Amino acid sequence: TEALGPAAYIGRCRVVPLRNTGAALSPMNAFQILQGLETLGLRMERHCENAEKLAGYLQQHKKVKWVNYAALPDSPYYTNCKNITNSKASGILSFGVLGGIEACTRFIDSLEMILRLVNIGDAKSLACHPASTTHRQLNDKELISAGVSDDLIRISVGIEHIDDIIADVSQALDKT
């Protein structure tokens, strides 16, 4: 402890419980991870399919300023997406809502099926407004540097039926 000071205690707090209990998963957790891995391919197909359809819908919406999704032909990342992932760009997209932060707040608050959470990769659709959640501690210059604008909404598109996802996004956009 003399050489490391308080860091020695922190290290002990991390190492001793692992030494005593091991870093082994419980049988139930191991089973659930295995189940998730076995269906990952199927779920990713649905995530990508739904995200591409939602991105196409958003491109046509009058209250949407821009859409960022690599599988769209007008994306600057389209060629890379096509070459690397066979045009499957994942289940995450972002878009800009006309009306700025106030419209984004109304959009997020109006979602009914899509959950308002900042994590990604769930089977359920999730949405967030990064400027007021994950990046809220940044100043304006840092937000710009991070590519986060006041009008940006990020959606992790789930595996629900695409008609349900679009209906929820549509009714929320109508309230902006």
Residues covered by each model-derived region:
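PLP-dependent enzyme catalytic core of the Aspartate aminotransferase-like
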Residues: 43, 109-110, 124-176
